Amino acid sequence: LAETEVAWLLKRRNAALTKKQMWGSLFQKTYRLSQPNRNVFDMRPIGQNPGTFNIQGMDIAWYVFDLTLAHATDVWCNEIVNALCPAGKKWLNFVSGTAIRDEKRDEINELLQKRTDVFFKFLHRSNFQLVVHECFMDAAVSTGFMTVNEGATKQDPFVFVSNPPDCIYADEGPYGVFDAYYRDWVRLPWDTARVMWPNLIKPTNMTENADDEVLITLYEILYRDHDVKDGNKPGAWKYRVIHPDTRTLCYKRDDRTSAFIGWRVKKLAGETYGRGPAMDAVAAAGTINQALYDEIVSANFRALPMYMGFEDGVFNPNNFKMIPNTILACAPTASGTWPLTAVPAAGDIQWSMLILNELRDQINNIMHTNPLPAMDDPKATATEILKRDQRNIENRAAQDARIQKEFFGPLVERCIDILRRKGLWDDITVDGELIEVQFDTPLVTSQGQTEVIEMLQHIQFVQGIYGTEAASAFYNTEKLSPWAARKLNVDLEVIKKEPELLEMMQQVEDKKAQMAQQAQEQGVPEGTPTQNGAAGI
């Protein structure tokens, strides 16, 4: 059975490799112009990492003459990481689902807020922030791939790994999301492999030598078995490590969640890998790069022109060098011409800066990274800057929705699964049933802030028509404070619950009634201010 599974997995892996190799030239072009210092595709083809060529320390960006797209890609990644998962902040909030009864909702939300604290306590301690930026750099071009491994200790339960784009491949399943991942490890030290996969089985043909470091090639494969159900989920995850030369199954385990996470910013229907914003802007970047290259070549010819020379018995064109303060011995011909003359210029390329700036603006518009006006620009106002930022956020909203589905969902599932196995996560039960944890991402939190602002505008509208005193009758005031706290992601422990607010409001009403009665008994006309400043009612 193991041999059959290995043969089947190797066949699937080779098919996925062939599919990704079809993207090789497009990846090469896009990485070259958007991330020149991360472009491995010029040095080694897909599927040959890193045995074909070692690029460590090499200058792989010398052929890029304009860095507009490279800078825009950096800004795009920085902005999206700061917007969706900023370092040191709780950018995600666990909330109760619609199945929870209203009387239990506040209690459950407080418990879930404590789970949020536990989640970020260990996430911020891990290397997540170091890895997520690298993955989003790949997502800017096509697809980001992250591995979430279980740590060795309870103090550090998470280990995150970014995967090089040339050595990981994926397959889409029947639900339109990735359900199989293949990661190549070429020339991996055997000692490192044994740490990565405990109880790793040694391939049959491998012999360890104390004098030499043993290097090995392994295929790391994870796929979803849709025939094995896991509760209401479509299938369990099968994790395998295979030695391709001997077809040895070196390691295996079954998981409830996926150790690999792959996400795309946007994609074309029917394709496996994404087409990110950098891929959209690469045409303009390529035009600028070629234009500047042509201008540099043209300027070189103008500054250092080519010369034609012929031998006149004194001057030898085969061994002369044009060096300042050098005397060239030559004899003029009878016609008075010299044996050395510059080649006439055959053409002159002059690109207008206006055209180049228009192309740069196209790149910034595609990447939503238009630079802000200078601080001392008299034409720029604070309102203009705020509106531009808001427009960029709205334009990225569709991208954020896909990231929320393909990245945040699997990430939270995997991290909770690891915390549960480590004994660091307590599940919540209501009426004897385990509730499923739901969460709000920064996109939802931003929408919540907008809803609170809209509510305040409505309150001001009602107050303007009916007056401040009468406006409170239009709302369930005991619900406003908890509602706004949830929308603004405020700690619920410092917010009074609805029953407490109702009791407090009732006490205020009773106090008003008592003061009115006392004023009436003392003969004070209604509406006359008392010593405490309250009017008799």
Predicted region positions:
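Long, contiguous amphipathic alpha-helices that act as assembly "spine/axial" helices in icosahedral shell
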Residues: 104-151, 272-308, 344-378, 385-419
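C-terminal anchoring/interaction modules
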Residues: 1-35, 39-40, 46, 306-537
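Structured, contiguous alpha/beta core segments that scaffold functional sites
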Residues: 7-8, 12-14, 149-324
